[in-house]
Amino acid sequence: MTSDLETQLQQLQTEAVAAITSADTLDALETLRVSYLGKKGQLSQILKGMGKLDASERPKIGGLANQVKEALQQGLEQKKSDLNQAAIAAQLAAETLDVTMPGTYIPQGHIHPLNSTIDKALDIFVGLGYTIAQGPEMETDYYNFEALNTPPDHPARDMQDTFYLPDGNLLRTHTSAVQIHYMEDHEPPIRIAAPGRCYRRDTEDATHAAVFHQIEILAVDKGLTFTDLKGTIKVFIEQMFGDVPIRFRASYFPFTEPSAEVDVQWKGRWLEVLGCGMVDPNVLKNVGYDPEVYTGFAAGFGVERFAMVLHQIDDIRRLYTSDLRFLRQF
């Protein structure tokens, strides 16, 4: 009986080792483990015969059975490790990046002419000591008109059509509204540049758009004069357009007094580029500033107009068409 069990154990080990060696997946290896070493596995079935052995024979068979079990466990662990390593190696081989292969070509983008114009203008004003200020595009009537010396019955309201919202608010018609917000929150002296989108009910054509961009500057301090305003604008124009002739023409804006428009001589003709003036005392009073102590000046211009002049664009609508043939020129 002893020799029979020894033979069965040796045959089991030989068969199991061969099967483990041939296993090519972790699932197949687990199936072999259950088949040979599980509670109902082949080794357990053989060991059931130990009950028929004499007490003196059992230690020998038990020791042999443990040797077989340990050999199979070691074989299973080694094979499992080998399969894991092979899987990792295969994955690495499949995911290896050949750095000598050409990459996917991604064409370089271009800065939109509106963005480049805004960036250039703001860089100039920041260099002059101005702070960038932002404000909401949806405004109240107070900030867009009344605080800027334009009450409901003021005739200047007829100068521009406005997009009114159902709740009584409106889409701002100029970035001048930003100066009111800023002055309410800051004590003078102040110097700000306020860029942003504006909205007016204009009929779109080659020079007008319902949505456009504007930059407004504001300076408030003791002793500021129109000479300071002219000097600031001259420096700005020179850095934007170069050494070109400029002229100031008397004009009217409800929130500045006196007011002026500025023209530059460009390509042999005069072009209007911005409006400016000294801040009206009523505007200063509306934000709690004493106009007897402080004076200020403001200027504003349309970014689209500047971009069209700088890049010789003949139609404002080209700036919004997303035509790559046009945009790739910049």
Curated annotation (Swiss-Prot):
Which key words are in the record? Aminoacyl-tRNA synthetase, ATP-binding, Cytoplasm, Ligase, Magnesium, Metal-binding, Nucleotide-binding, Protein biosynthesis
Entry's InterPro entries?
A: aa-tRNA-synth_II (IPR006195), aa-tRNA-synth_II/BPL/LPL (IPR045864), Phe-tRNA-synth_IIc_asu (IPR004529), Phe-tRNA_ligase_II_N (IPR004188), Phe_tRNA_ligase_alpha1_bac (IPR022911), Phenylalanyl-tRNA_Synthase (IPR002319), tRNA-bd_arm (IPR010978)
Subcellular localization: Cytoplasm
**Domain of life of the organism in this record?**
Bacteria
Q: Does the keyword Aminoacyl-tRNA synthetase apply?
A: yes
Q: Name one GO biological process term.
A: phenylalanyl-tRNA aminoacylation
One example of the protein's molecular function in GO is: phenylalanine-tRNA ligase activity
Q: Which reaction does it catalyse?
A: tRNA(Phe) + L-phenylalanine + ATP = L-phenylalanyl-tRNA(Phe) + AMP + diphosphate + H(+)
Q: What class of enzyme is it?
A: ligase
Q: How does it assemble?
A: Tetramer of two alpha and two beta subunits.
The similarity annotation says: Belongs to the class-II aminoacyl-tRNA synthetase family. Phe-tRNA synthetase alpha subunit type 1 subfamily.
Name assigned to this protein = Phenylalanine--tRNA ligase alpha subunit
> Its gene?
pheS
